[in-house]
Amino acid sequence: MVARNKSGNVEPLARVQTKRLALNATAIESARHSLDQGALTPHYGPWRQDVIQLLNDSLATELVCVLRYKRHHFTAAGLASPKIAEEFLVHANAEAAHADRLAQRIVQLGGEPDFSPDTLTRRSHAAYDESQELKAMLKANLVAERVAIEAYSQMIALIGDKDSTTRRLLEDILADEQEHAEELKDWLAD
């Protein structure tokens, strides 16, 4: 490559030194120690507690969603669409599976899953709902799914490459929530 100097003469550009891709040997050596930490290695860094807090808030969201879907399943059973009431149960079970996966990841990161019923609704991103009419139930569940989608999308962006295992978990859950939202949107349109 060349460039013109002030006098207009062409001069070669100096080569820019770039850092080569290389593994962090110190971190690899550190991984040989602290075996009681299991999968936790130094790369988790200072944000591990923040990730645990985000996961605990998502755990609360999933548990509130389980409770809302279960209530809607049982109270919608006598309403216009038994098929939708049954689907509420399917969604409740999916949300329970999400909660289990989140709790498991919290433990893997060295945290404790917070199942405290006293703080669930305060920590949850989504609201509990006691609607009596099927259409209102569908709408409440769609709102909750959309809130969860936004929360998971933001968490995935925040975590980035800091914790690829947690990011993949959240991406899997996000895909399920997006599917739930599409189903609810279709039922509302009927």
Model-derived features: positions:
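Iron-associated oxidoreductase/ferritin-like identity signal
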Residues: M1-D190
